[in-house]
Design a protein with these regions (language model features):
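PLP-dependent enzyme catalytic core of the Aspartate aminotransferase-like
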Residues: 148, 317, 326-335, 341-374
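Conserved glycine-rich beta-strand-loop-beta hairpin in the small C-terminal domain of fold type I
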Residues: 265, 281-290, 301-314, 345
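Helix C-cap/helix->beta junction micro-motif
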Residues: 125, 185-186, 296, 331, ...
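Conserved core segment of the aminotransferase class I/II
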Residues: 213-283, 290-292
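PLP-dependent aminotransferase-like
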Residues: 44-45, 82, 100-160, 181
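N-terminal small-domain helix-loop-helix segment of the aminotransferase-like
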Residues: 2-89, 269-270, 371-374
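A short helix->loop->beta-strand "cap" motif at the edges of active sites that frequently abuts
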Residues: 106, 127, 185-188, 213
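Active-site phosphate-binding strand-loop segment of PLP-dependent enzymes
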Residues: 136-203, 210
């Protein structure tokens, strides 16, 4: 089976370890083990005591009861624990969910631009994939009327990313309700990758799981919860889809493992402290980035809506990938070129790095851009 490379992952696999100033990532500045230990005010005693009781075997295949209980708290409706399945990050959740639903010849609508697996996996499985575009002239938002035109009586799946990667667009509860109404009219599933939880205007945000009965939602502790090292995600779906996913999980991961499950559970148990920390990073760093952009005549963006991923447009006479390679080689600064998201003439800016990395990365990026004016 041939499948396209994921442009952003291929880029990071090659270049991220060469960076001195990494402002490409979309995780909110990753927690150190020291910061994690401090969450329980007992130097991590509750985490280590849990591990001390456990044998280092496979553990709970689908995720421990404690893990599932913490995940269930993230949704407004009551979620059956049997419908929460632990996965290898959100990437694994998306893979298993799409494989469980999509068959050759199916019609799939995918938000675009977005994280490539949401449209490349269905295409590789033999589906006809049409794009529902985020439009720059609409402030990088999609047009609901366009979705109505795209949907067909036999549309099987609509894939969305809320918030979107790399642009950072957040679809509010009203928009999700309209998507649900359109999907319901033809009986389509809606897969919503929710790994980027918005940290502002949260009263306007709802999970697709709380909006639509045929929603499939995916998430992880990697981005908003700053713990990608755990490699733990989850998928929430109805009984039929959950049972199909169980079969695919046996082929793709078996289990998350005792240690990873315990770490992810501990993170979710202390999510309020983590989110308080991360709001300060998101809002403070966004202000830093905005001030820098305001002083740059070659850079623009639509400011992200309280999420950790953003896209800057670059007005430069050089292909974005060549510019990013040169920026890394000459100044040690890492961005992800927009062409890796099929968005040329820009870059993903990981503005939620540590403040010192962001400030120096932007300063050096500004130096590189100034060279075009000499």
């Amino acid at each position: 089976m041939d499948i396209k490379t994921i442009g952003v992952e291929e880029w990071l696999n090659v270049w991220e370890k060469s960076a001195t100033w990494d402002i490409a990532q979309s995780t909110i500045s990753s927690l150190t083990m020291g910061e994690l230990r401090a969450l329980d005010d007992q130097d991590g005693a509750t985490f280590y005591e849990r591990l001390d009781r456990e044998k280092m075997n496979y553990g709970w295949i689908e995720g421990s009861p404690e893990f599932k209980a913490e995940v269930a708290k993230l949704y407004r409706r009551e979620v059956n624990p049997d419908h929460i399945l632990q996965t290898n990050g959100c990437t694994g959740a998306n893979l298993n969910a799409i494989m469980a639903v999509v068959e050759p010849g199916d019609h799939v609508i995918a938000e675009w631009p977005t994280y490539a697996p949401l449209y490349e996996i269905p295409r590789t499985l033999g589906a006809e994939v049409e794009y529902w575009e985020l439009r720059e002239e609409l402030g990088w938002r999609p047009d609901i009327e366009e979705l109505k035109r795209l949907v067909r009586p036999k549309t099987k799946l609509i894939c969305i990313n809320n918030a979107s990667n790399p642009i950072g667009t957040v679809l509010d509860a009203d928009t999700l309700g309209q998507i649900a109404e359109i999907a319901r009219s033809v009986g389509a599933y809606v897969l919503c990758d929710e790994v980027y939880l918005p940290l502002e205007n949260t009263e306007d945000f709802m999970s697709m799981a709380d909006v639509y009965e045929k929603a499939i939602v995916t998430n992880s502790v990697s981005k908003t919860y700053s713990t990608p090292a755990a490699r733990v995600g989850w998928v929430v779906a109805d009984e039929e889809v959950s049972n199909r996913i169980r079969t695919y999980r046996d082929y793709t991961m078996i289990c998350g493992g005792v240690f990873n499950d315990a770490l992810a559970t501990y993170v979710l148990e202390h999510k309020d402290k983590i989110l308080e920390r991360n709001r300060k990073i998101v809002f403070g760093n966004r202000d830093i980035a905005q001030a820098w952009i305001d002083a740059q005549h070659r850079v623009s963006w639509t400011a992200p809506q309280g999420v950790s991923t953003s896209f800057i447009q670059l007005d430069i006479p050089e292909h974005d990938e060549e510019f990013c390679k040169r920026l890394l080689a000459e100044r040690g600064v890492l961005l992800v070129p927009g062409s890796r998201f099929e968005l040329p003439c820009g870059a993903r800016l990981g503005y939620c790095a540590s403040e010192d990395v962001l400030r120096e990365g932007l300063r050096l990026l500004g130096e590189a851009l100034a060279e075009f004016d000499r």
